[in-house]
Amino acid sequence: MLAMMLNTTLSACFLSLLALTSACYFQNCPRGGKRATSDMELRQCLPCGPGGKGRCFGPSICCADELGCFLGTAEALRCQEENYLPSPCQSGQKPCGSGGRCAAAGICCSDESCVAEPECREGFFRLTRAREQSNATQLDGPARELLLRLVQLAGTQESVDSAKPRVY
């Protein structure tokens, strides 16, 4: 009887130890474990949004250069698929804010939220003009400044009501 209890206890301890040591504590564990990400090339995140023109920035964030960002809307639904892919991805052009990347003109997004970021204004309107297949309305002068100001105002009020789906 004592030998059977000892055997059961030893087996339970071994299985517990095995479970603790083999765990990977972030959702998309790459091949080779969590420290192997430095050796891997980052792929572009999944396309999303109208016509697949955007890129996923998080499980509920889809941003496109010409369209802005969709947070928690139908356009961002495809981004939930990123959670099930085995390799990490990266969207955006340059780093900004605290752990984010420039997602659209004047907008910096991390995998959880987006904020207005002045350093992300540069380059986006030039990029959209350079694209021959672009069918978006181009903004210059006062219209552009008004749109950017509205984005900034929306970013400052973001913390007030973060549960509602929004489009930037």
Swiss-Prot record:
The modification Glycine amide is found at G32. One of its GO terms (biological process) is response to xenobiotic stimulus. Its main location: secreted. Glycans are attached at N135. It holds the Pfam family Hormone_5. Keywords: Amidation, Cleavage on pair of basic residues, Disulfide bond, Glycoprotein, Hormone, Secreted, Signal, Vasoactive, Vasoconstrictor. Residues 1-23 form the signal peptide. PANTHER family: NEUROPHYSIN (PTHR11681), VASOPRESSIN-NEUROPHYSIN 2-COPEPTIN (PTHR11681:SF9). This is Vasopressin-neurophysin 2-copeptin. It comes from Rattus norvegicus (Rat).
